[in-house]
C-alpha cells in the first residue's frame, strides 16, 4: 500500500504565541525520561541480588525481566485509550501513580521476603513506565514546532541515557555495596539462622533506594499537577476528534511508514537488549582470564558510549535530516555487530562496546518518524510502537538459541546485525519518501 496520511487538523499547539510556555513542561517531561531509565536499569542490579537472596534458578531470576516486558506490553493500548478520552497529562499522572505504587510495594515485599510480591511490584512499575512512555514520547514530539520534533525527542532521550548511568551508580552504592556478597564457601559455614539473616539483609537493602524513588516520583507528579501545559489540538475531545480503537487501527494499518516503524522499533529493542544481555558472556568467552566482575566494566562503558552517542546524535539531528542520521547509525551498528561476530577477541569486544554509541539515537528517531502525520491516531499509533519493547523478550532468546547451536557467543551477534539491517532499510525508505 502507499504511504497514506490522514487529513486532520494541526496536531500542534493551538496558539502560536505559546513557545515560551513550553520550557517548564518540556523540562518536566525530560525528568520522566530520566525516571523510567532509573527503574529499567535497576533491574540489572536486582537480578543478582535476588538470585542469591531467594536462591533462584536462572529461569526464576529471569522472571524479573519477564514481569517488566509483560507490564510494558499490555499497558500501552489502555494508556492510549485513556489519553484519547482525556489528555496526555492524564496519561502521565496515571503512569507516575502506578510507578510510585509499584516501588512502594518493595517495602512490604522486603519485610516478608516474598519474591512473588516483588514481581507484582515490578509489573506495576513497568505498567506505569509503559504509560509514561506512551504519553511522554509523542507529547515531546508535538510540544512545539513540527520541524523540531525529532530534535526535542532526542534531547529528552539524552536524559534517559543519563538516568541509565545514574541507576547503575545508585544501585551499586545503595544496594550491592550495602551488604557484601559472600562466596559459597563462606555461606556453607553459616548456621541456618545466620544464612537466613544474611539473605534477608540482601533483600532489605532495596527498601531505602526504592522509597527514595517513591518520594521523587510523587514530587514530580505534584509539579506536573501544578503546571499548566500548553493546550494541544490533539487533546480536543469533540466528536470529530474521537474515533474507536478499531477504526484507528484500520487507518494505521494503511500507513506504510507506521508499519515499518513498528517493525524497526521491534528490531531495535530486540538488538539492544540482546547485545547488552550477552556482552559480559562475550567478554568471558573471548578474553582469557576475564572475570565476570571485570567484564561488568565493559557494560558500564557501553552505557557511557550510549550517552555520548545520543548527545552527539542529537546535535547531528538538529543539522541533518533525521532519517539520514538514522540510516548512518544503523549501518555502522550493523558493521560493528558483524565485526564482533567474525573477529572475536579484544577487537570483537571493543566493536560490541562501541556499537552502543550508534544505537543511541535509534529509538527516539524511529519513534518520531513513525508517528509523523498520524493526526488523531497518534496516541494509538505511539501505543503500538511502545509495545514493541516485547522485541527484547523475543530477540534475546533467539540470540541465545543461535549461540547454543553455534557453540559460541560471537556467531550469535549476527542476530542483532540483521536487526540493524532492517532498521537501515526503514531509514532509507523514509529518505526516499522524503525526497519524493
Region locations from a protein language model:
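Extracytoplasmic gate region of multi-pass secondary transporters
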Residues: 43-47, 167-168, 172-178, 251-300
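Hydrophobic core of transmembrane alpha-helices in multi-pass small-molecule transporters
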Residues: 115-132, 347-361
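Extracytoplasmic
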Residues: 24-52, 136-137, 275-283
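Cytosolic juxtamembrane N-terminal segment immediately preceding the first transmembrane helix
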Residues: 1-32, 36, 52
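Intracellular juxtamembrane helix-capping segments at the cytosolic ends
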Residues: 131-145, 360-375
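Central cavity-lining transmembrane alpha-helices of secondary-active solute carriers
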Residues: 63-81, 300-312
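Helix-to-loop junctions at the C-terminal end of transmembrane segments
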Residues: 75-88, 309-321, 403-404
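C-terminal ends and interior cores of transmembrane alpha-helices
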Residues: 97-112, 331-344
Amino acid at each position: 500500500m502507499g504511504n497514506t496520511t490522514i487529513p486532520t487538523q494541526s496536531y500542534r499547539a493551538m496558539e502560536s504565541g505559546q513557545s515560551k510556555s513550553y520550557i517548564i513542561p518540556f523540562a518536566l517531561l525530560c525528568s520522566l525520561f530520566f525516571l523510567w531509565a532509573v527503574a529499567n536499569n535497576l533491574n540489572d542490579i536486582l537480578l543478582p541480588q535476588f538470585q542469591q537472596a531467594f536462591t533462584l534458578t536462572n529461569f526464576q531470576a529471569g522472571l524479573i525481566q519477564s514481569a517488566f516486558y509483560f507490564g510494558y506490553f499490555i499497558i500501552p493500548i489502555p494508556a492510549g485509550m485513556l489519553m484519547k478520552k482525556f489528555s496526555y497529562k492524564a496519561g502521565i499522572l496515571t503512569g507516575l501513580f502506578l510507578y510510585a505504587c509499584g516501588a512502594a510495594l518493595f517495602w512490604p515485599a522486603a519485610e516478608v521476603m516474598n519474591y512473588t510480591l516483588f514481581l507484582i511490584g515490578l509489573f506495576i512499575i513497568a505498567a506505569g513506565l509503559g504509560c509514561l512512555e506512551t504519553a511522554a514520547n509523542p507529547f515531546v514530539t508535538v510540544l512545539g514546532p513540527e520541524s523540531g520534533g525529532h530534535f526535542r525527542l532526542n534531547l529528552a532521550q539524552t536524559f534517559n541515557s543519563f538516568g541509565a548511568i545514574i541507576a547503575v551508580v545508585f544501585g551499586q552504592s545503595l544496594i550491592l555495596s550495602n551488604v557484601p556478597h559472600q562466596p559459597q564457601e563462606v555461606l556453607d559455614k553459616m548456621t541456618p539462622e545466620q544464612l537466613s539473616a544474611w539473605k534477608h539483609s540482601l533483600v532489605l537493602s532495596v527498601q531505602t533506594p526504592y522509597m527514595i524513588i517513591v518520594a521523587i516520583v510523587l514530587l514530580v507528579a505534584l509539579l506536573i499537577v501544578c503546571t499548566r501545559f500548553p493546550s494541544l489540538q490533539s487533546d480536543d475531545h469533540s466528536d470529530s476528534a474521537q474515533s474507536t480503537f478499531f477504526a484507528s487501527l484500520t487507518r494505521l494499518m494503511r500507513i506504510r511508514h507506521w508499519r515499518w516503524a513498528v517493525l524497526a522499533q521491534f528490531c531495535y529493542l530486540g538488538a539492544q537488549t540482546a547485545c547488552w544481555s550477552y556482552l559480559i558472556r562475550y567478554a568471558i568467552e573471548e578474553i582469557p582470564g576475564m572475570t565476570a566482575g571485570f567484564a561488568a566494566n565493559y557494560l558500564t562503558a557501553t552505557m557511557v558510549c550510549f550517552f555520548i552517542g545520543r548527545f552527539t546524535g542529537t546535535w547531528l539531528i538538529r543539522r541533518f535530516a533525521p532519517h539520514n542520521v538514522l540510516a548512518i547509525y544503523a549501518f555502522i551498528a550493523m558493521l560493528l555487530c558483524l565485526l564482533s561476530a567474525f573477529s572475536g577477541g579484544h577487537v570483537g569486544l571493543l566493536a560490541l562496546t562501541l556499537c552502543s554509541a550508534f544505537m543511541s539515537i535509534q529509538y527516539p528517531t524511529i519513534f518520531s518518524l513513525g508517528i509523523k502525520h498520524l493526526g488523531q491516531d497518534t496516541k494509538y499509533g505511539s501505543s503500538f510502537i511502545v509495545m514493541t519493547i516485547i522485541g527484547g523478550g523475543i530477540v534475546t532468546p533467539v540470540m541465545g538459541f543461535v549461540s547454543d547451536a553455534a557453540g559460541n557467543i560471537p556467531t550469535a551477534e549476527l542476530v542483532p546485525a540483521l536487526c540493524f539491517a532492517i532498521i537501515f532499510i526503514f531509514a532509507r525508505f523514509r529518505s526516499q519518501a522524503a525526497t519524493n
